[in-house]
Amino acid sequence: MSPQTETKASVGFKAGVKDYKLTYYTPEYETKDTDILAAFRVTPQLGVPPEEAGAAVAAESSTGTWTTVWTDGLTSLDRYKGRCYHIEPVPGDPDQYICYVAYPLDLFEEGSVTNMFTSIVGNVFGFKALRALRLEDLRIPPAYVKTFQGPPHGIQVERDKLNKYGRPLLGCTIKPKLGLSAKNYGRACYECLRGGLDFTKDDENVNSQPFMRWRDRFVFCAEAIYKAQAETGEIKGHYLNATAGTCEEMIKRAVFAKELGVPIVMHDYLTGGFTANTTLSHYCRDNGLLLHIHRAMHAVIDRQKNHGMHFRVLAKALRMSGGDHIHSGTVVGKLEGEREITLGFVDLLRDDFIEKDRSRGIFFTQDWVSMPGVIPVASGGIHVWHMPALTEIFGDDSVLQFGGGTLGHPWGNAPGAAANRVALEACVQARNEGRDLAREGNEIIKAACKWSAELAAACEIWKEIKFDTFKAMDTL
């Protein structure tokens, strides 16, 4: 099929094209603790053997090119090349294979997710010999993890800053996401925070548009935060989206947020880019700001089962680049998210050490060597009837975010927020008493309705709303 290179200068230069597998398929290779390991789902073109396809991925994402070049003799390819060291068929699909590739750590710049992805998921994804290619998982070695700052603060520091423990946090995305004036936007934030939510949020595409410039929004939202805090005695926050067209403008917005004294800012990390995200994360740690991350554009990359990159890889990359929250799907809402897969990458976000578990899509054991964790955010098509399931699935270290499920309440924003707070506290109390939320959830919510008119009204309006018509695209 395609190229390859001799690995030792002593062999001498011999021009021509060789099969990749002659050099890059090494089933005898024993992986090192310092290697970055990748699991690719490979769909070769007809007639291309899986060994050649896996070797091609290893070559084109590391040191290889389409033909032998004389400059190979000026370095040690054995030291720097990627190696396809194991291939296994995908059960139920004879045309697909999981190819495992090991990359020497020296191929990557320290502390740069940008450089890591440029190599591993760069040009190789357009390679003609492959019909499709998907990066399913990465093992990041501790030696490389330690070159990253990671989240600005992490789960425990955030709880200490907010003085909130023993329950999930509650949020709300302000709707309509576009079109409100800054003052009306701030009013909606205030009503939600006063009603019992911990956070309100800019939607991902709220930046600085003609109908609402960023500085005006920041000021009115800060006013809403301080007024709600004074009335409730609780610390409140609003995710002020600092995403901008340049890194300089992004940091300017974060600086203004800090000057206002608010606790948290936000970034769209995929559309904004990993370099921008890491820059903002470093600023947030240095200046005491929490950082909420939205994953806008992720489904372009991760939704197709045979091509792209799984979200668990994007989640690991975010933990390295830096963020205190990230949207992770809901399992029960309107957006894509199969339960076991979601729980797999939720653990990768929060826990310090995660064992290999193929039943949840985790291909490698991952040791984060005490890097702070990231709080998963469940958001998208959820309402009070989902509260028992969300509490059971995500546990305490999560943010449950109800946009339409707050602002769509028949009595208004503050009653909508109150309904969510009552439902959450009822579920947490029931769980702490040993009740089974999965089995008794509806009864728990109905019982709470007896002493909360706001919750009763919310339950009535959304009693028929479900999003289980469509099956998840990405399954194990």
Curated annotation (Swiss-Prot):
Family from the record: Belongs to the RuBisCO large chain family. Type I subfamily.
InterPro entries listed in its UniProt record: RuBisCO, RuBisCo_large_chain_AS, RuBisCO_lsu_C, RuBisCO_lsu_C_sf, RuBisCO_lsu_fd_N, RuBisCO_lsu_N_sf, RuBisCO_lsuI
N6-carboxylysine modification, residue list: 201
Bound cofactor: record note: Binds 1 Mg(2+) ion per subunit.
Organism: Sorghum bicolor
GO CC, any one term: chloroplast
Lyase is among the record's keywords: yes
Full protein name: Ribulose bisphosphate carboxylase large chain
